[in-house]
Amino acid sequence: MGSLVTDLPAAFQTTLLKDGNEKGDNIHKEIHDHDITIGDEVTKEEARHMVELTEEERVIEKKLRRKIDSLIMPLVVLVYLMNYIDRNNYAAAKLQGLERDLNLNDTEYQVGLSILFVGYVLMQVPSNAMLNFCGKPSWYLGFFIIAWGLVSTLTSQVQSYGGIVACRFILGVVEAPFFPGILFYLSKWYTKSELNLRMSIFYSGSLISGAFGSLIAAGILSGLDGARGLASWRWLYIIEGTVTIFIGFVVTFLLPDFPHTWKLLTPEMKAVANRRMALDAAEADLDAGGKTSHLAGMKAAFKDPKTYILAIAYHGITGAAGFQNFYPTLTQTLGYDSIISLLLVAPPYVFTVFYSLAHGLTSDKVGNRFWFYMYPVPIVIVGALLFMFTDGFGPRYFSLFLLNFIFVMNGTIYAWIANAIPRPPAKRAAALAFMNSIGNAASIWTPFTYNDADKPYYREAMGINIGLVGIAGICGIIMRFYLQYQNRQLERMENEDATLTERDVKKLEKTAELEGIDIATARMLQKGYRYII
């Protein structure tokens, strides 16, 4: 009888034992803290409930969660807000003469916009390795926040096309580590059952930036033009970049690294924090069937068709959302000056913030991903058509509210990804990195579809947006049928008394390979598990 030992972050281990002459897997649990060995073979469900928090620990856990939420979540949302503000102030600066002062033509402006995402995509994978090497999230995140604030501030001094392209590329490089870094960081503080809501709140930072970033830009651009001999768009970079640098220092010294190192936690809270994360990891390790290396996780992710379906879908969503980089330019086509155009950006984003949170909560409550992913598709298409073929202020401004439903899809697809690729963690991490890179690659080429010659309707860009959101919708339909097929296979395979054909065994082997686990564990873990559709 062989065994597979899974190392856990706490002082206990779970050993999965496989016997080829018996059905399923047997679980042998050793708790080393107390030198206790439970020799009886138990089922997977019994193993899951063998170690739980006591009632007293649960009371402490609630206090712990409130303390974590009160500091960590406001900080990460604030930083994500500044991340998008610093990234998108390029569009606001365009309204106040950036193109004119730097002698940029239409194509050169678009290159300056898209080059950021070249650096962003290239830095995605290396950033995770850098974070693991650093080992201190506060220093790691703080350094890159300060770095992109500094780059944003120095952008105010550029005098040429080459200067703006260089600054935008470097900005993409130093902004890239933040998103995967936050995913890693939050996973060290919150259990998997707590992460969904926190990620929804975190994502709202990007939408809030669309609303308040335009209001801040309007105030700066209207009041500081010519101050100390500088154009208002230069002041925009100086002020917003300086604020980001300050926030970076706050994060460096205020953001706690890990529960066991946070001085504001009592010894009891630290113990509960470590214990609850250890229990969460133990359950995850049971699901994974063993520890999976980053290389094995990448291989498993690239062999899974779901990875490619979701990556193409995310590319379509991100590409169709490319209008956000031109939002002030789109509102300017409504017939108002640059300041009013910036103010008009805020209401659609404010609406989207509240709607997206309600959408996400409802989707979780209903337990459905497909319909909540699909219903925004026709809404976005109608919004694009309205912008393309109407002239009045009312319908054209209303079309922007409809176009913003693409951000609702963006939130839903991340929840779908988490369910469609649940284990092992290394596979999920590799799949997320791949999908994020493929998705953001759309931002490299879509800026070139928004040409000044196409004002005020931007029919080429809007037509491409319709095609991209249509592709995302088709991928959603394919995903639904594929998950239904996999659920039927899970239902068939979970019957241990059923005689498996050679074809069934091959399917089970493929499932085990895709999940990164052995065949016996795969069959046992299938019991009762179904993909959310």
Task: List each language-model region with its residue ranges.
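Extracytoplasmic
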Residues: D69-D106, L122-M123, S127, G213-A217, ...
